[in-house]
């Protein structure tokens, strides 16, 4: 398989069409989409050669667009920086304005998978901007802050928005972030699990500060999308829920 390469610098995405999960409703399997040639339609795969942040060149076999969504202040930018750079953004909180993105290439079972990860603004005034970016997303990580009950209560509103603007087969995962702040926790783990079960979503708790489950969340999504786009007929189906439960349990000893 010949690998594509892209120079790293900032870029933009192109919108497309939609639908999604309902409480206790079945969700169809997503056939993940790899990058294809420059003649692909605007609502189709990401394009090879699309610029990304940083210097140097990324070599990859397939690429997918992953969006982080949720209320302002839930830690989307910190989670992304932790995964991309292995660092924690401590200090003054600065809200994302509009939308931004970073790229990272993972080795998934011998396949170079490029994740183009979009960090969205959670404030209401930027919603019309972020709506357009839902449409060609292959996966969405929906975050709430375990120390902020309102951000958890708003998850259903986010799911309604996703249902309206995202593709019906988008890969979706629910993340309860900031579990390092145990003394400030107001949303129990069981509440997150219950909501995720109601909507049929994989779920885990994360910490951008300690790194708990951050790599796991993105790796699980990369595995799911890679298999959707490249699964051989004889290859067993990758089960995202089972993988998250199995691998997440190994990190339980580190939970605050």
Swiss-Prot record:
Listed GO CC annotations: endosome; Golgi apparatus; Golgi membrane; plasma membrane; secretory granule membrane; synaptic vesicle membrane
Annotated consequence of substituting residue 123 to L: Constitutively activated
* Location of the motif Switch 2: 119-136
Name of one Pfam family that matches: Ras
* EC supergroup of this enzyme: hydrolase
Q: Which family does it belong to?
A: Belongs to the small GTPase superfamily. Rab family.
This chain belongs to the protein called Ras-related protein Rab-26
Organism this protein belongs to: Homo sapiens (Human)
């Amino acid at each position: 398989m010949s690998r594509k390469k892209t120079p790293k610098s900032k870029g933009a995405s192109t919108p497309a069409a939609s639908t999604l999960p309902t409480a206790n409703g079945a969700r169809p399997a997503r056939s993940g989409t790899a990058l294809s040639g420059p003649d692909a339609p605007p609502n189709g795969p990401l394009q090879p050669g699309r610029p990304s942040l940083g210097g140097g060149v990324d070599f990859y076999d397939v690429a997918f667009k992953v969006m982080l969504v949720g209320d302002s202040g839930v830690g989307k930018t910190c989670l992304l920086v932790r995964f991309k750079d292995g660092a924690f953004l401590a200090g003054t909180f600065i809200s994302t304005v509009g939308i931004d993105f970073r790229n990272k290439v993972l080795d998934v079972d011998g396949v170079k998978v490029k994740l183009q990860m979009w960090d969205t603004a959670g404030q209401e005034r930027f919603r019309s901007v972020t709506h357009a970016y839902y449409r060609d997303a292959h996966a969405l990580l929906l975050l709430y802050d375990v120390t902020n009950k309102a951000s958890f209560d708003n998850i259903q509103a986010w799911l309604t928005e996703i249902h309206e603007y995202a593709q019906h087969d988008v890969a979706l995962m629910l993340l309860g972030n900031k579990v390092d702040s145990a003394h400030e926790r107001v949303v129990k783990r069981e509440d997150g699990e219950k909501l995720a079960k109601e909507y049929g979503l994989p779920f885990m708790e994360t910490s951008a500060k300690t790194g708990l489950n951050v790599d796991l969340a993105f790796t699980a999504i990369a595995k799911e999308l890679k298999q959707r786009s490249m699964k051989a007929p004889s290859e067993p189906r990758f089960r995202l829920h089972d993988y998250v439960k199995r691998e997440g349990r190994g990190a339980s000893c580190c939970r605050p």
